[in-house]
Every structure is written in C-alpha cells, then in structure tokens.
C-alpha cells in the first residue's frame, strides 16, 4: 500500500506486558487515538536508510527505509520504497534501494575527483533512460 501519513510514536508506547517492543501494541494505540484500522499502521524506523542503521549497527536496520508520504509498502520484502526514479530501474532488496538495470554508475577517475575538489569541473554520472546508460557530464562546462 501507499504511505499516506507518517506519525512518530515513542517506543515505550509499544511495549507489551513483558516490556518488549511489539508492533501490534503500537497499532492498537494508533487505532484508538487516530480512528484508523490497526492493520493500516506499519512500523518504520527513523534511523534506517538503504537497509543501513544510522548507529552503524546494521542489525538494527528495520524495513529498509524510513517511510515517507508517497512511499510504497512492499509486504513481501518488508521494505518501504521511495518513488521509482526511472521505469527501467529494479529493486535492490539487499540495500533497499532502486538500482539501474546495469548497476551503479561507474566511479569517477582520480583525475575527475581532483578536478571536482578543485572546483574546476563538476563531473557526475547521470542516468540516460532512453540509452539505458550512465552518461558522464561536467555540469560546470
């Protein structure tokens, strides 16, 4: 389903009788206080992006990405997905991100990186949907 609202909730409002965080407890609380069916509330983690946790402990990563309005909930993969950037891009479920059909953009050369740092050039790769390729451009040229 499509994310239409994101609410924050203290984790202590989600504790069950054993003191363990439990999504169903949070769903019941939200249903009571927001008058929407419990099953419409799906927990997300503010600290998770691209299946990585902000603390550096990726075992804490939860549901791929922090949900945002317009994101799509993928129940099969347990991931919140942002809008697909290009029609040809595919789901990379390992990193919870969209990826071009030919993979990530090539790395810039050391010379290009040095030119970017010196602000003499601004080399970047941009996805070319019609050509299905990464095009290198200098945005300062």
Per-region residue spans from a language model:
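Interaction-interface detector
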Residues: 1-141
